[in-house]
């Protein structure tokens, strides 16, 4: 067959040589001396071709060079056996590629040759890089006899066997190899232990980190939930509220342009206090800014402990509606009026709650400017809630900076300035005055009169339509407000001192017949502390009632945290962190000890049926509380079968009336027989007033100012009225709305208690469940006020007329046998300030 190219010749030669090797084995190699070189050349060509096939994606130029070198080697190695060709054909380029070997299926042969080359290298080079003795011993001429000594019949067989053979090494290398292997295993073991330890530490750190991050994650989840809820609310806003969503019940408060109702949400059945502001009155009184400010501040203070929450607002064509928290126990003032004064423990607790409320407000740059007992509400747990932010002020950053550097103005002391102040107070408009601030009801049942120095009633009588130019209430306003000074949080600290004084003493510290007198006392800081006033409380009040705002206790403290006030001895023992979670001390009828006298508390339990209701009895009581007069409905008369010394027939009544006409007190009895009379000291807190007390056949208990000869009021009669004597001088008279503290200087307290109880049984019967006269020691303290009511004043107590003639002896005391004159003496219509 004629060959057309060198490549075909080489291919054919290689194929023949491979077939010869397979058939003849070693003998073929021995017969052909040049076969070794030819085999090597062929193997080289095949190896290069295989490498080219495997790395065909690499640089083509380098592979082409390798192929050319292999071709040259193969040509030089086979010159002895290959026939000579023409020179022009011999100079042709020889090209060996993968396609040539693919055609004759020599890929398997390339793999075998590569394995043989690897075996040769492993057997002749040890692990340390030195040439082994096997290579030196087998350096024969042909280099093929070493395969025979190893038991292989051909290089191919040796190549196949090399896949399972180990590396040929020297003994020294094997020893080094074993040491290295052992060291490697030890390193692996140590690294595994270190990894296990690190893994445990990582797990522990991860768990602790998870525990630390858990609260933060919960907060983040809550924030995300709140944000999602807000987004949902924004996307799906709640339907607008209207008056039709609430059932309006009784009204619980009234202002100059608003009325507060108790209402029930028809959807949730929750009770709310809804303040209804009439738009017409707001425009007439120019209260637009007050309404906006109140809404803004209430939104800011909502969900803050100690403040009334604003649930929602809405409006219609006539009114604006503020839906607020309903304070079930009402405001604090009726409690002070009811029990006369708080004990020290009760005062300490509520003063601490007010201090916390001031800290919350001032931390948010809010100054209330009208703190007073009427604006301090009590929830169902008897904790305080601050309300009525119509006079509040939100301080800007600039105003707050000025407040810290505030210098008080010079006090106005000369008479010219006083005259100017008087003119200003009489002529300027009023921003604070409303019906709520007009009425300070101390619980006395008077004929539109006030027994003691009640400033608010005197304001109303002095100038009912007078206007003033400041924001606040007269008894609690600070000097800097009267002097038109900058408004600072110290104004609320002044009011706090006034409230602490009133809780202990029973009356505000500044009192007078009109606003001007009160303002003069405030500017002079004329505070009188009666006997029995707690010393620590007195020190606290003195440090709070300073004319210069900078000198007040707490004024130099950081905004929102009054550390100096908290550290005052009066607040010793207060746990500020859990104050609002504690149960407040019960409010007992309390008579502070004066001089050497002991403190007295009552043991009689007042009926707790003062909650608002819809029956006729409750409506009558609410109506009397709203109008400030007693009920005109006569209580049913229950006849007692037992003989009573006060049960007089008509003839006896006429005889007694004729005898008492010459008595100067007859004119105050309104045609009724005076059964018992005597001078008593009527106590309210730490203040006492001398009064003439009359017990008549009404039954009525009338007390009169013996100096001015003015009827001051009456103690309202009811089946629930009880008398309780504490000793020979002091006795209490309990009514559903108030406890009256009376002191008989002549020592007839027991006689008074028996007389009052006999008259009650005569008028209303003698139920077996009630005792005749109550007596308890001064240490008893079981009487607690458990529900709220307005202290109802009554000038016309229900009178029960007796018609059946029953013989009865006259009163036992000498003062009861005095005759009365036949003519009625007129009384002065005016009322002057009682002496302190």
From Swiss-Prot:
Active site: 370
Pfam families with a match to the protein in the record: PH_3, Pkinase
Compositional bias (Polar residues): 798-836
Residues recorded as bearing Phosphothreonine in the entry: 641
Top EC class of this enzyme: transferase
Region feature (Disordered): 206-245, 401-464, 788-836
Protein name as it appears in the record: 3-phosphoinositide-dependent protein kinase 1
Chain intervals with Acidic residues compositional bias: 416-452
Example of a GO cellular component annotation carried by this entry: cytosol
Record keyword Metal-binding present: no
InterPro entries associated with the record: Kinase-like_dom_sf, PDK1-typ_PH, PDPK1, PH-like_dom_sf, Prot_kinase_dom, Protein_kinase_ATP_BS, Ser/Thr_kinase_AS, Ser_Thr_kinase_AGC
Location relative to the cell: Cytoplasm
Binding site for ATP: 256-258, 275, 325-327, 331, 374, 388
Gene3D superfamilies cross-referenced by the UniProt entry: Phosphorylase Kinase, domain 1, Pleckstrin-homology domain (PH domain)/Phosphotyrosine-binding domain (PTB), Transferase(Phosphotransferase) domain 1
Keywords recorded for this protein, A-Z: Apoptosis, ATP-binding, Cytoplasm, Developmental protein, Differentiation, Growth regulation, Kinase, Nucleotide-binding, Phosphoprotein, Serine/threonine-protein kinase, Spermatogenesis, Transferase
Chain positions with Phosphoserine modification: 645, 804
Similarity annotation: Belongs to the protein kinase superfamily. AGC Ser/Thr protein kinase family. PDPK1 subfamily.
A single GO BP: positive regulation of organ growth
Major localisation: cytoplasm
EC number, as in UniProt: 2.7.11.1
């Amino acid at each position: 067959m004629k060959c057309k190219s060198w490549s075909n010749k080489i291919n054919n030669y290689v194929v023949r040589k491979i077939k010869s090797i397979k058939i003849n084995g070693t003998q073929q190699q021995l017969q052909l001396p040049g076969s070794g070189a030819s085999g090597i050349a062929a193997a080289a060509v095949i190896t290069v071709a295989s490498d080219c096939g495997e790395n065909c994606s690499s640089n083509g130029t380098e592979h082409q060079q390798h192929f050319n070198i292999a071709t040259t080697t193969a040509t030089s190695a086979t010159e002895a056996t290959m026939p000579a060709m023409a020179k022009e054909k011999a100079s042709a380029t020889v090209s060996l590629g993968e396609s040539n070997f693919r055609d004759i299926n020599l890929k398997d042969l390339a793999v075998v040759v590569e394995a043989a080359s690897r075996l040769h290298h492993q057997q002749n080079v040890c692990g340390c890089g030195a040439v082994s003795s096997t290579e030196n011993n087998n350096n024969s001429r042909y280099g093929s006899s070493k395969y025979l000594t190893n038991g292989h019949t051909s290089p191919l067989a040796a190549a196949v066997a090399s896949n399972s053979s180990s590396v040929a090494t020297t003994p020294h290398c094997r020893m080094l190899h074993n040491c290295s292997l052992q060291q490697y295993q030890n390193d692996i073991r140590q690294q595994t232990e270190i990894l296990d330890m690190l893994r445990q530490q990582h797990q522990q750190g991860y768990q602790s980190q998870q525990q630390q991050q858990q609260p933060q994650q919960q907060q983040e989840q809550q924030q995300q939930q709140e944000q999602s809820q807000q987004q949902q609310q924004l996307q799906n806003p709640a339907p607008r509220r209207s008056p039709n969503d609430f059932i309006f019940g009784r009204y619980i408060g009234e202002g100059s342009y608003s009325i507060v109702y108790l209402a029930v949400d028809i959807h949730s059945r929750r009770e709310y206090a809804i303040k209804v502001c009439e738009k017409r009155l707001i425009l007439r009184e120019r209260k637009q800014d007050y309404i906006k400010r109140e809404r803004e501040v209430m939104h800011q203070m909502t969900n803050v402990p100690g403040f009334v929450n604003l649930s929602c607002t809405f409006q219609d064509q006539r009114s604006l509606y503020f839906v607020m928290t309903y304070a079930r126990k009402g405001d604090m003032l009726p409690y002070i009026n009811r029990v006369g004064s708080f004990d020290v423990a009760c005062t300490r607790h509520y003063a601490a709650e007010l201090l916390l409320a001031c800290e919350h407000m001032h931390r948010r740059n809010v100054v209330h400017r009208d703190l007073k007992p009427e604006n301090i509400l009590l929830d169902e747990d008897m904790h305080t809630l601050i309300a009525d932010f119509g006079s509040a002020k939100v301080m800007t950053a600039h105003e707050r900076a000025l407040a810290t550097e505030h210098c008080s103005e010079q006090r106005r002391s000369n008479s010219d300035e006083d005259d100017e102040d008087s003119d200003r107070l009489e002529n300027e408009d009023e921003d604070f005055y409303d019906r709520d601030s007009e009425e300070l009801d101390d619980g006395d049942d008077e004929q539109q009169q006030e027994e003691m120095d009640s400033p608010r009633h005197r304001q109303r009588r002095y100038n009912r339509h007078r206007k003033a130019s400041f924001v606040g209430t007269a008894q609690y306003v600070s000097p800097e407000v009267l002097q038109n000074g900058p408004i600072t949080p110290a104004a609320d600290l002044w009011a706090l001192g006034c409230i602490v004084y009133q809780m202990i003493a029973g009356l505000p510290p500044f009192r007078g017949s009109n606003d001007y007198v009160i303002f003069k006392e405030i500017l002079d800081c004329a505070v009188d502390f009666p006997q029995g006033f707690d010393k620590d409380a007195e020190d606290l009040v003195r440090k709070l009632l300073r004319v210069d705002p900078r000198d007040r206790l707490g004024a130099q403290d950081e905004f929102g945290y009054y550390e100096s006030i908290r550290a005052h001895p009066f607040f010793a023992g207060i746990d500020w962190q859990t104050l609002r979670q504690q149960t407040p001390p019960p409010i007992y009828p309390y008579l502070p000890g004066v001089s050497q006298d002991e403190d007295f508390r009552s043991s009689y339990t007042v009926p707790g049926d003062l909650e608002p209701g819809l029956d006729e009895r409750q409506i009558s009581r609410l109506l009397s509380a709203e109008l400030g007069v007693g009920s005109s409905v006569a209580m049913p008369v229950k006849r007692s079968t037992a003989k009573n010394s006060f049960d007089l027939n008509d003839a006896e009544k006429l005889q007694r009336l004729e005898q008492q006409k010459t008595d100067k007190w007859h004119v105050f009895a309104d045609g009724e027989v005076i059964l018992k009379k005597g001078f008593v000291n009527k106590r309210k807190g730490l203040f006492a007033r001398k009064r003439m007390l009359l017990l008549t056949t009404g039954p009525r208990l009338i007390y009169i100012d013996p100096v001015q000869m003015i009827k001051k009021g009456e103690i309202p009669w009811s089946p629930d009225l009880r008398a309780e004597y504490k000793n020979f001088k002091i006795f209490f008279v309990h009514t559903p709305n108030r406890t009256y503290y009376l002191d008989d200087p002549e020592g007839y307290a027991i006689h008074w208690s028996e007389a009052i109880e006999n008259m009650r049984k005569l008028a209303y019967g003698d139920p077996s469940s009630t005792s005749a006269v109550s007596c308890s020691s001064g240490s008893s303290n079981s009487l607690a006020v458990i529900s709220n009511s307005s202290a109802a004043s009554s000038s016309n107590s229900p009178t029960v007329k007796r018609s059946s003639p029953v013989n009865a002896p006259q009163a036992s005391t000498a003062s009861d046998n005095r005759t009365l004159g036949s003519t009625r003496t007129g009384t002065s219509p005016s009322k002057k300030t009682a002496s302190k």
